[in-house]
Amino acid sequence: MKKIFLDANIILDIFNPSREYYNYSLKFYNFALLSKYKLFTSCDLITTIYYIDSKKDTKQALLNIQDINKTLKVIEFSNKEIEETCQLMILEPQYKDLEDTIQYIMAKKYECDLIISNDKNFISKDIELITSKEFCKRYIK
């Protein structure tokens, strides 16, 4: 396992101790960095993270984004991936959430081995999907 895609909720967790999965997400994140995994997220999640974090503290939200920018590869998507996302959602009705489906398409494009998300509704047909808690129990001794 070398490439891991992070959903927005994982990134939000690592910067906010009051979130339910903070400890697991932070433990996963630190382990992944030390283990030299390649971590990915998509560009649209950066604005989502800023929007949520800036409600509490704008400067800290920007510092968090700078940290993400240094430790994760932020990947872009374009018309092609949007079309793939729409087609997948039309053909396979279990894909209901546009943002999550774009993340799945981007994880596939970058050949990620794993998607980490604490969203119980996230769908991933052919990339392993686990929570930060499951990752910690499975891979961190």
Would you name each region that the model predicts?
Residues 1-40, 54-63, 135-141:
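Short, well-structured N-terminal submotif of metal-dependent ribonuclease cores
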Residues 3, 109-141:
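Acidic, PIN/NYN-like endoribonuclease modules and their adjacent C-terminal/linker elements
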Residues 9, 44, 101-105:
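Active-site phosphate/pyrophosphate-handling residues
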Residues 26, 44-46, 50-74, 80-81:
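Active-site-proximal, substrate-binding regions of enzyme catalytic domains
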Residues 31-32, 68, 88:
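Hydrophobic helix-cap positions at the C-terminus of alpha-helices
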Residues 34-36, 70-71, 125:
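Structured helix-beta-strand junction loops
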Residues 40, 75, 130:
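General small-molecule cofactor/ligand-binding pocket signal
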Residues 73-120:
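Active-site neighborhoods of divalent-metal-dependent phosphate/nucleic-acid chemistry enzymes
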